[in-house]
From Swiss-Prot:
Self-association and partners: Monomer.
Compartmental location: Cytoplasm
Name of protein: Beta-hexosaminidase
Gene Ontology CC: cytoplasm
Keywords: Cell cycle, Cell division, Cell shape, Cell wall biogenesis/degradation, Cytoplasm, Glycosidase, Hydrolase, Peptidoglycan synthesis
Gene name per UniProt: nagZ
Recorded family membership: Belongs to the glycosyl hydrolase 3 family. NagZ subfamily.
Pathway: Cell wall biogenesis; peptidoglycan recycling
Site entry: Important for catalytic activity: 175
General function of this protein: Plays a role in peptidoglycan recycling by cleaving the terminal beta-1,4-linked N-acetylglucosamine (GlcNAc) from peptide-linked peptidoglycan fragments, giving rise to free GlcNAc, anhydro-N-acetylmuramic acid and anhydro-N-acetylmuramic acid-linked peptides.
GO biological process: carbohydrate metabolic process; cell division; cell wall organization; peptidoglycan biosynthetic process; peptidoglycan turnover; regulation of cell shape
Chain residues that bind substrate: 62, 70, 134, 164-165
Gene Ontology MF terms in the entry: beta-N-acetylhexosaminidase activity
Amino acid sequence: MSTLLIDLQGQELSQEEVELLSHPLVAGLILFTRNFHDRAQMQALIQSIRQRVKKPLLITVDQEGGRVQRFREGFTQLPAMQAFACLIDDPVQQTNMAQQAGWQMAAEMTALGIDLSFAPVLDLGHQCQAIGDRSFHSQAEMTLNLASAFIDGMHQVGMAATGKHFPGHGHVIADSHLETPYDERPKQQIFAQDIQPFQQLIQQNMLNAIMPAHVIYSQCDPQPASGSAYWLKQVLRQQLGFNGAIFSDDLGMKGAGFMGNFVQRCEQSLQAGCDLLLLCNEREGVIQVLDNLKLSETEPHFALRQQRLQQLFKRKTIRWSELEATSRWLENRKILTALQQRWLDNKANKH
């Protein structure tokens, strides 16, 4: 059963990485800035992966826009998601620009050979260190409208959408990359506010995948959401009726340390309801998991998990030369880059 997404150490594929990626437990990989030199090199790396690993691999990246954009040189400088509502007054224009940003991101990643960018962020508010201007808005309705438009743009290109970080990472100050944050708000407040964008998009059948937060919601469950059967099985699957794939957030992050060693983190996440597990920047941890994680094809959700994985591969193929020749790409590149520059100038002036 393929369940693990791992990372690469450099800009070329090593023989060790070919062997790791070929392991039956490995479903795919996530790319980072360290893997990127320029567009030609990245296309060659992806081609090498496809040729040398003799099975389909889900190739992913975080290309959200703003400060979380792994590939910059040669790509559209996508605006931070907060910029749409903050810098554009007309609601129709706000959603139009969000849709164009979703399309532009997905088109560029698809032309590069990537299946999936983990987007959009559905967290509310801008106070959290880890989220900040990655979120569209502090209000659920505005977040829903802008995220829906962004996803529509992604879907036009044939890229699956991943809502994150369920049930909402926006109301904690701590960064889950560095520690395990606690959200101590009452359950009613989380359900009335933070969960709304997720719930509405699930009802509209717009989310193909969801990534939970490494956050402990202490009034609801003692486990972080990424390892909580309450959040993933009871709330997400049963109450909200979500049938798509559930990714763990990176199990190499400090916020996941609450769940034990790397094998225990994977086991708990799977038992809680995750289908696919990210384990990044921990090569020894990856090897430990591949050597020790035991999964059976007789496991009740085996076939369903594999089916959910298959739904995440890109639906269309487009050449970069074809993309560059389209008027939509050219116009978007100009407008979105200008919007991001306005956003950066706006932030600089506030400081």
